[in-house]
Structures are given as C-alpha cells and as structure tokens.
C-alpha cells in the first residue's frame, strides 16, 4: 500500500490556503499519496499524525522570531502565527512518534526551532561572512549555487559525491543548530543548507527546493523524495 504523506499548506491574504503543485507531483512520482494539511488544525495533530505515514513541512513565510526568543528584526518578512502554531505542534508530534519528516526551506528552519535552535531573521543583515546570492533571479528549476555535503550523511549517500548544485529562494537560514540535528550541507559562504537528525529514523531538512528541481529531472532531488517515501513505507 502506498504511504499517505501530509504536506503543510501556506496562507495567503484573504481566505485562502495553497500549495505549489511541485510538492504534490514529487510525492506522487516517488510513490506516495499526498494529503494537504492546512493551518488551523493544531488541536488535532495527534489524530493527523496517526493517520499519516510521513510529513513534508513546506516552504513559505518567515517563522515568528518570538518562537526562538527574539524580537522582530527590521528586515523580517511576513509571519503567519496560525501556521506556525499548527506546524510546531505537528512537527513535535511526528518527532515524538519517530515518523519520517522532510523539511523544505522554511520547513527546515521550523524543525530547528522546534528543537530549540535559532535562525537568521535576515541573512544580509545578520550573517558575518560575505554572502553569495540566496534569492536567485533565475527560474525555480535552475540550480544556482553549490552545496558541500558531509561524508556519510543521507544526502552524501544519495548524491554519491561531495558537492551538489541547488536552487535558492530564501533570506533566512538556520543559525544555531539544535540537538539532535547535525549539519550535513553548507554553501561556500558557510550558510547551512542541510541537516539531519541523529536520533530519529529519518528526519531531513534542506534549505533549497528539491520539489522544483525534481520536476526538471535532477537525480539527487528525485532520490531525496524516493528515500523519504521508502522510509515512510517501512513503518
């Protein structure tokens, strides 16, 4: 039986929630059945977790800095407290149940915050080292910069090489990494691009958008979703 995969949705202005189709297609093509999980269901996260085999924390708006003990930086973008509340509760539930999680962009940052870590509210203003471009102007399917992978990590095993190229659409990033996560990918300017849990069966976070590269035929991105679905199938 194909595993049922929850994917969190984003909030827009007005009474709408949405999800880019690339997430859905990537899960289907990897062998899973996608189910959208909207904001506003925080009180039912246990029931949701029990119904699902895996969770994708999708990209989107900035996470409220209050959740990691900071005041808002002048350069912080839009925050959506209702989404933050639900996803924090859902992530905790999945971590407690040791069910597979794939955190993408904002989703990786949120995983780190859930476990006690912090993020840069704005890379340009807060990162010490000179930065490469992290908000590319090229198409979403274009891999714009390099990421160096940690040997023997999930991504290193999938890629079978020390470096991959990824797309980039963010102005925030993981800052202080929380236990049980370890850094498994960095860009040339030192920005954390990937992390994985040393405690759980499969919890992986990536700062880029593999669902967009998946659609363009990128093999590493396809393998990310395939190994995620495989772990969701082995519950």
Predicted segments with their positions:
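Short basic/aromatic active-site micro-motif
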Residues: 168
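The feature captures the ABC ATPase H-loop/switch
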Residues: 108
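Catalytic cores of DNA base-excision repair glycosylases
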Residues: 159-165
């Amino acid at each position: 039986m194909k595993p049922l995969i929850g994917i969190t949705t984003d909030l827009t202005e007005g009474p709408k929630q949405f999800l880019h189709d690339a997430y859905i297609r990537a899960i289907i093509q990897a062998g899973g059945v996608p189910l959208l999980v909207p904001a506003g269901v925080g009180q039912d996260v246990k029931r949701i977790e029990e119904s699902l085999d895996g969770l994708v924390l999708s990209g989107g708006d900035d996470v409220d800095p209050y959740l990691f003990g900071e005041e808002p930086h002048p350069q912080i973008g839009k925050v959506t407290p209702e989404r933050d509340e639900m996803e924090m509760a859902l992530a905790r539930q999945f971590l407690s149940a040791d069910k597979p999680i794939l955190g993408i962009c904002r989703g990786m940052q949120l995983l780190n915050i859930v476990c006690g870590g912090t993020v840069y509210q704005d890379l340009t203003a807060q990162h010490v080292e000179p930065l490469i471009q992290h908000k590319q102007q090229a198409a979403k399917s274009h891999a714009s910069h390099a990421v160096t992978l940690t040997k023997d990590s999930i991504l290193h095993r999938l890629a079978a090489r020390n470096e991959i190229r990824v797309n980039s659409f963010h102005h925030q990033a993981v800052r202080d990494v929380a236990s049980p996560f370890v850094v498994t990918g960095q860009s040339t300017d030192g920005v954390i691009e990937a992390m994985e849990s040393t405690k759980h069966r499969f919890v992986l976070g990536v700062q880029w958008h593999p669902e967009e590269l998946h659609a363009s035929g990128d093999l590493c991105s396809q393998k990310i979703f395939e190994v995620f679905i495989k772990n969701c199938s082995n519950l």
